[in-house]
């Protein structure tokens, strides 16, 4: 398994020729396409969101406005994860379909990727649930066939997460899965398509108002 923080031209060539590549982007910067390399730029618009272990409290818009008015950091605003606990990637990392405490170090070091520009029927291995205001499709772990190779993207700094037993267990489980014959992504994508999707600005949702229609 080739482990990379950037998809350099050398890594891309190995991938397209049949290598298994684990891509671990380490910041929440936007990914920009440059020639045959996917790199990260601090000057580009971030198309990721922050990592948040606990469900965002109560009303994202209200607390977002309060934070902005007080020049405070706004919560990432996400609502936990959604995954298939029977997926072979979890053989060494037991999980439910939702967030639980073993996920804390992984999510704490994460920056989920906005997948709005990808195929509507594509589902990441680990999806992050967004709040109703943004309603982005967010991915923590994604996989594709690329050329003759196989690519797995994890939007968590697993080296930092590995300071904790849970983080190490997840990292080892990911690598064990990738080294096995069970690593066989159903979805396919070309490098050109991947570059284009990552470079496109995601859709923007504009809600005029949120109404409480309950009887409480």
Outline where the language-model segments fall.
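Soluble or luminal CAZymes and related metallo-dependent hydrolases
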Residues: 3, 134, 166, 170
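Catalytic beta-strand/loop cores that center a nucleophilic Ser/Cys/Thr
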Residues: 30, 55-165, 182-216
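Short, charged/polar low-complexity linear motifs in solvent-exposed/disordered segments
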Residues: 40-41, 108, 169-172
């Amino acid at each position: 398994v080739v482990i990379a923080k950037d998809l350099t031209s050398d890594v891309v060539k190995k991938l397209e020729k049949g290598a298994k590549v684990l891509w671990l982007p380490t910041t929440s910067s936007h990914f920009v396409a440059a020639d045959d390399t996917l790199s990260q730029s601090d000057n580009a618009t971030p198309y990721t969101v922050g990592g948040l272990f606990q469900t965002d409290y109560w009303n994202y818009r209200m607390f977002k406005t309060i934070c902005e008015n007080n020049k405070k950091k706004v919560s990432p605003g996400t609502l936990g994860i959604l995954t298939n606990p029977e997926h072979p990637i979890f053989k060494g990392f037991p999980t439910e379909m939702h967030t639980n405490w073993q996920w804390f170090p992984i999510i704490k070091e994460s920056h989920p990727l906005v997948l709005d520009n990808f195929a509507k029927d594509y589902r990441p291995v680990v999806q992050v649930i967004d709040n109703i205001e943004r309603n982005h499709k967010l991915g923590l772990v994604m996989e594709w066939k690329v050329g003759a190779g196989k690519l797995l993207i994890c939007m968590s700094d697993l080296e930092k997460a590995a300071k904790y037993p849970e983080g190490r267990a997840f990292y080892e489980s990911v690598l064990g899965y990738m080294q096995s014959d069970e690593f066989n992504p159903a979805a396919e994508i070309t490098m050109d398509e991947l570059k284009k999707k990552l470079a496109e600005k995601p859709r923007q949702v504009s809600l005029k108002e949120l109404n409480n229609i309950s009887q409480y």
